[in-house]
Amino acid sequence: HRKIKHILGTKYRDRVGRLLVSELFTVGQGGWSGFPPHKHDTDRLPLETRHDETYNFRFKPDHGFGMQLVQREDGKVGDAYHIVNGSTIILDKGYHPCVVAPGYEMYYFTILGGLSQRPLVQFFQPTHAYQIETIPGIKDMIAKFK
């Protein structure tokens, strides 16, 4: 799972427009982040908000690597991107979990820009949404974006 540190979180609501800026860390070595698969590419409250997102990745040790997945349509095969130290990914559509290889730690700096509002409402892929109940700390992480 992951640990999150908000740099421009909800407490700065009146001073930063529609930006959310955070640092995310994998906890332990290897593992998934952004799981269960989620998206935020459509304004349809109360289920989801439209936020474009940019990630910049770092690994420890710096020769580590991971994979960014992007599934643009539910039920269809998506894209997989090999990410290394310094990789930048821009996401504007689709479910987008990522994973770091065993034996490595992953950090990523993330900037989310809300197109209509600042608070983020993530829509979790229905086939995997039940995982929210099984992952320690995930509900607290979700609440911090609102």
Located regions from the model:
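Active-site region of the double-stranded beta-helix
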Residues: 1-85, 100-146
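Short, charged beta-turn/beta-strand-edge "cap" motif at the junction between a beta-strand
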Residues: 95-97
